[in-house]
């Protein structure tokens, strides 16, 4: 696997702000450190894990990190879904789940009903 295309801070903030503008919610960043932590998880995993994680595991790291770290005042789950889909798109894949399935899955992530590994399995076995 060649080095994936990563999501940077400016891009994820722009997508978050767009979600707030289009769908409502409390704007703003609650903790930039938590956001940076969530954004660095997949890249760190890629560089320091042996064997290297696959694209589904890396996308899951974005989704899980953003949903669980809760770095924004609002729209963390929406932003987590966008991050997974964007990462997959940037790297030649698509998230082919229905809107309802994506919603239910990210709710389960935020509620700690599924693990990061289970999220990666959901992505790889069913939806990319």
Q: Where are each of the predicted segments found?
A:
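Core of compact, soluble alpha-helical bundle domains
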Residues: 15, 19-26, 30
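Short, conserved aromatic-histidine micro-motifs
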Residues: 93-111
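Helix-hairpin-helix/helix-loop-helix acidic hairpins
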Residues: 32-65, 69-71, 121
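Basic/polar, acidic-poor N-terminal "presequence/leader" segments
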Residues: 1-15
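Mid-chain, well-packed structural core segment of small domains
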Residues: 65-99
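Alpha-helix N-cap and coil->helix boundary residues
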Residues: 30, 34, 78, 97-101, ...
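A structural-propensity feature for long, helix-poor, extended segments
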Residues: 107-123
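Conserved small/polar residues in nucleotide/adenosyl-binding loops
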Residues: 126-128
